[in-house]
Structure formats: C-alpha cells, structure tokens
C-alpha cells in the first residue's frame, strides 16, 4: 500500500456521472485521489486512461485504483494486461469484498451503465475496507504471472 493511500480514478464517458459521485464518497472520507480522467461525457478510448492508472498502481504512486466504464469489461481487460495489476469487475458489495479477501484486487472496476449510486457506495466501501486474507489465496495469486 502506498503510504498516502491515494486512489487512482479512470472513467469512460458512460461512467462520468458515477465518477463524480464516487469522488464525493472519497472526499467525504477524507481520502486523497488522483483523477486520471476523463473530464466529460464525450466518447473516449478507455486504454488511454487505463494504462496510466495501471502504471501508477504498479509503481506504488496510487493504491488502490478505481475505474468505471460502460460495462467495465474493456477497461478491466486493459488493466489486467499489466503484470502487477489485479483489476476486479464488481457491481455488488459482496463481489468487491471477495475480490479483496480472496484475490487481493488492487483496482476496483465498476460498470457505469449497470450500477446504482447506492450499490456503488456499498461496493466502494467494501473494496476499500476489506483486507486480503492471504494463506491459500496468496499461493493462488503467486501462480498468476507468466
């Protein structure tokens, strides 16, 4: 974990409104974050935002990351191309909790088209507050890199 517990945010146009809502959640908790974009609802290419976030998480400059796009799939696929990234597509609190407990996910990905603000609040809080269990789960994570 980065000592500053900074959060990296990447958002595609379908997640822009949810991005602004998530920033309010983070602000209310006094958590610092770096917003990697986008800054509007205009169409954009998610890899242009995903790669800088992934590199920042890998370098320890921000931790954890939060990414939002329409379905969440494209940005999750892009993020997971990076060796040090375990991006988890989550749309419910329990999925986010398990992604942290069992998979030590370091980037939360949410589908902007398919998650309400209420569920996003619970999902973000679960992701930020759930520790990794380690043990047998660490053994499995150690087998991920090629």
For each feature predicted by the language model, list its residue ranges.
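Mid-chain, well-packed structural core segment of small domains
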Residues: 67-113
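C-terminal binding/interaction regions
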Residues: 14-17, 93-146
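A generic structural motif
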Residues: 29-34, 62
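Short, structured active-site "lid" loops
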Residues: 49-71
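Glycine-rich phosphate/diphosphate-binding loop of Rossmann-like nucleotide-binding domains
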Residues: 9, 13-29
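Single conserved hydrophobic/aromatic residue that forms the stacking wall/gate
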Residues: 1-11
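A short beta-strand-loop structural module common to alpha/beta enzyme folds
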Residues: 32-43
